[in-house]
């Protein structure tokens, strides 16, 4: 099933696109979809992960819900039609 990633700010720059569609299967997780994203856009991985761990300032959303805070993190199972998003830290002044 096609699953769309929406990428924001410098994450879109690293990927070269704001929207990337990956192929996922029933039972796949957010982490599986992220692995597929890194296959398409390998420059993203070092921006999203540090020493194999998700950087604390990166927000991973599934249908608008932060999977790290409100679901099962990268082990959250995907449903058909899910939209995923990666947000870098937001700062302002």
Region annotations inferred by a language model:
Residues 1-92:
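Ubiquitin-like/PB1-type beta-grasp interaction modules and other compact soluble beta-rich domains
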């Amino acid at each position: 099933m096609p699953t769309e990633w929406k990428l924001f700010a410098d994450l879109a720059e690293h990927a070269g696109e704001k929207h990337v569609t990956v192929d996922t299967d029933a039972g796949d997780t957010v982490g599986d979809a992220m692995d597929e994203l890194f296959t398409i856009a390998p420059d993203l991985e070092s921006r999203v992960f540090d020493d194999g761990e998700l950087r604390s300032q990166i927000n991973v959303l599934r249908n608008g819900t932060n999977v790290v805070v409100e679901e099962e993190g990268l082990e959250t199972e995907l449903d058909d039609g899910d939209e995923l998003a990666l947000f870098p830290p937001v700062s302002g002044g």
